[in-house]
Amino acid sequence: MTELDYSKIGLKVGLEIHQQLNTAHKLFCECPTTLHEEYHTQLERYLRPSFSELGEIDIAALFEWQKGKKYVYRVPPNSCLVECDEEPPHIIDEEALSIAVAVSLALHSTLVDEVYVMRKIVIDGSNTSGFQRTAIISLGGYIEDNGQRIGIQTIALEEDAARKITDSPTEIIYNLDRLGIPLIEISTAPDIKTPEQAERVALKIGQLLRLTGRVKRGIGTIRQDLNVSIQGGVKTEIKGVQLLELIPDIIKNEARRQYELLRIKEELQKRNLNKDIVKNSFKIVDLTEEFKDTNSKIIRKELEKNGRIYGLKIAGFKGIFGWQLMPNRRFGTEVADYVRALAGLGGLFHSDELPNYGITKEEVEKVRKILQINENDAFIIIVGPKEKLDIATNTILDRILYAFDGVPKETRAALDDGTTKFMRPQPGSARMYPETDIPPRRIDERILELSKQFVPEQPEIKLKKLIELGLSKDLANTMLNSLRLDLFEELVKKYSPKVSPTFIASTLEITVKYVKSKGGDISVITDNILEELIKYVYEDKISKDAVQEILLELATSKTQLNEIIKKYTPLNETELEKIIIETIEENKKEIENKKDKAFNIIMSKVMNKVRGRADSKKVIELIKKHLG
């Protein structure tokens, strides 16, 4: 697929950056903001939507309730009754509020006079109460990008959701350790015009947040949501982009998806089709008997569980289900996503992809005959329990009919390959209502004074300071954008100048990336481990060269750090000199025959023996001494 002209199709992108704050307490109670795997009890809940003050039910909440899932909550030792929704929330945390105020000021946003907490209905189980508490801190503002001002719409404080442990068709298990951790949400205006600009703006906002020195790091602590639309399409919400580098691909693919859905709408009009024609000719036939001897593993597996096989006729839709919307995803995939989300069924096949999946040409012809499929028609085969098939057929018809309208209003989930899938309908205005258990909090002089310590430095000033520490411009830029910037500054204060800032920065960024490139599990390389190794270098317990070797072994084996370190005890000069003399003696004939390469030969062999136990500069010095 050729890339679209984004100015021509009217691409608009807005960002929602969600970042956990590194505070002592949660947003509405005094519990700590640390995560714990252990738990001492668990709760079980079922959640259901309720009518708003205007008598409306939010469509997204209704969608989640229809799944009928049970929610199980593990209660860790660092949790209280607030997280369990058995005690009213406490007043808003001052530290979190002060950080949000500081960020607001840095983004030229206008602070509200009083902070009012609202309830946002969420009944996917991620909140025990059935809603998420959120509060607007400031309005308006901007961030610069290549001379253009990207508007800020709102900056809000909200509580993070419970941490999902497992998800099955009937229940979801959550841990309450994450529920209530303060989260700052920065929403930009839809001023972003290209996929690459979106990545730059997200990077700059993330950088600004890190420069406060009060945000959490690691997987799941920051999340980018995207709002994407093109001319003729609709604003689509894309949730849960974890990696910045995925942002351009996700936007490109969403723009393409909306563009292709609009093309499908045009194609259906060219075919003189309309909703009434498709609806009136829509046919459902039970094909279970016809597939009783099939070789399709998917269908046979369902038949063994007493499932049924339905065939659906869709008039005039030949070629539509196979229409590619983005890489590896077609219109048929979109329909299947709706069925999976609403009916919990995964076995859907359409005529544009058959014969395939063990379904033979003869079986396809049999289905065409039974459903009375004409040359321009299409059909779908769906398998599952009868009670779910009834929901699935209604879902399929609804999604097919929406093709005549173009792009549906959806919330979609970001996938690791840069594509997206249907998640749920977009929530409506019936989702929000006031929190009656928390009094308003005025942004007074005390909060403004507290916020001063968190106002982030300008990136240009911070970059200059990093270069003044001796870092190259490239390494300084890498460190400026690093999630470990605050750790770097802490280690420099403790261990430089004996351990150079350049070595510390290289270890935190370049060495860790090297370990990852070698297949290492870098999740085991914690801040504590990195500091411990820098401290060992400072105390001359290991050499600088040993750090990379130790981290690589730690990330590629199950060996404990203290066991690995034992193998890298530094050699003293006498021991090192002995090894060098022995190596020269062992390779005497070779270096006599290759005098011009003698140094390289001995250097290679010595380093193989002493790697990680001796400083390479010292090795070079002693080899030169003994080679003459």
Curated annotation (Swiss-Prot):
Catalytic activity: L-glutamyl-tRNA(Gln) + L-glutamine + ATP + H2O = L-glutaminyl-tRNA(Gln) + L-glutamate + ADP + phosphate + H(+)
MF term (GO), any: ATP binding
Keyword NAD: no
Enzyme class: ligase
Cellular component annotations (GO), alphabetically ordered: cytoplasm
Keywords linked to the UniProt accession: ATP-binding, Ligase, Nucleotide-binding, Protein biosynthesis
GO biological process terms, semicolon-separated: glutaminyl-tRNAGln biosynthesis via transamidation; translation
EC number: 6.3.5.-
Transmembrane stretches, start-end: none
Keyword ATP-binding: yes
Quaternary structure and interacting proteins, as annotated: Heterodimer of GatD and GatE.
Family note: Belongs to the GatB/GatE family. GatE subfamily.
The protein's role, per its UniProt record: Allows the formation of correctly charged Gln-tRNA(Gln) through the transamidation of misacylated Glu-tRNA(Gln) in organisms which lack glutaminyl-tRNA synthetase. The reaction takes place in the presence of glutamine and ATP through an activated gamma-phospho-Glu-tRNA(Gln). The GatDE system is specific for glutamate and does not act on aspartate.
Xref: PANTHER family: GLUTAMYL-TRNA GLN AMIDOTRANSFERASE SUBUNIT B MITOCHONDRIAL AND PROKARYOTIC PET112-RELATED, GLUTAMYL-TRNA(GLN) AMIDOTRANSFERASE SUBUNIT E
Identification of the protein by name: Glutamyl-tRNA(Gln) amidotransferase subunit E
Native organism: Sulfurisphaera tokodaii (strain DSM 16993 / JCM 10545 / NBRC 100140 / 7)
